């Protein structure tokens, strides 16, 4: 099946700064995608290229099988929800949503029907005559979405569009966005630097750094099997330690062998090991895989964040529902499945092949 939208080796430069470096992406119809990465990684530039606000320096942007490199923004079946919403303060809610429809010179009855449907979808029926100054931040967000979807775009772009909301409202809007996307069935492409937001909202995530795609996959794939240290650090909390692959299903960490589920990596190959804090249990010091000293503890609401130091001076973070006394000796335990092996220098393609070989082995 042909992708709805593709970037083929797309590059973009501002002055002497390389913003996008030979980007390749495929976007299928009807899914929620997120471009995730730190400030300056190029994610908003991708949105601008899709919307037609910028042109690529090199490469091709393909929409439904045709190049749209030089297609003007107003001819693209794309709408954008901006970070500041970009609502017209001198127009009421109805006229804000109807603005694009009036430019198309639709009949008044058709405009009224479409505006009503859009307001119903974002759960703001009856707000037609409200002023923009008289509604809350969350309501402005919904009006901006209604104004975008009323034009029936194939793709909806959202540029950091939840960042101005407080935590509670942002969480509520995450549910709203997922529901709206599911009901409309159109493609959403969302930009954020917030990894929790990306994990909660997305069908698929592109993790970006320095103008390049570091990893693409489902939230679970990226969280459970990060391709490199950057992705492991950026997506959630991680314990990352160095080690060597002894043989298939056995890795050495700090001179001690541990069972794992990885295979196909050369013996004695230097690797990096990721163990998530929630996958580690605190037990009696003598019963653990190794002993650590509790260095600090913070209460995070649903769990305690406990930092420990092992005998070699390395720090370990554990998320536990149990308290631990600072200064006490405890044991750490984790299952072989909790160990995720990363091979330094491994490309995403090589990484994907390795992970696929595990699945083939499991199904054999």
UniProtKB/Swiss-Prot annotation:
Record domain ABC transporter: where: 5-235
Catalysed reaction equations from the record: ATP + H2O + polyamine-[polyamine-binding protein]Side 1 = ADP + phosphate + polyamineSide 2 + [polyamine-binding protein]Side 1
Disulfide bridge positions per record: none
Pfam families, A to Z: ABC_tran (PF00005), TOBE_2 (PF08402)
The entry's keywords: ATP-binding, Cell membrane, Membrane, Nucleotide-binding, Translocase, Transport
Domain of life: Bacteria
An example Gene Ontology molecular-function term: ATP hydrolysis activity
Record EC number: 7.6.2.11
GO cellular component: ATP-binding cassette (ABC) transporter complex
Keyword hit for Protein biosynthesis: no
Function: Part of the ABC transporter complex PotABCD involved in spermidine/putrescine import. Responsible for energy coupling to the transport system.
The protein's name: Spermidine/putrescine import ATP-binding protein PotA
Organism: Staphylococcus saprophyticus subsp. saprophyticus (strain ATCC 15305 / DSM 20229 / NCIMB 8711 / NCTC 7292 / S-41)
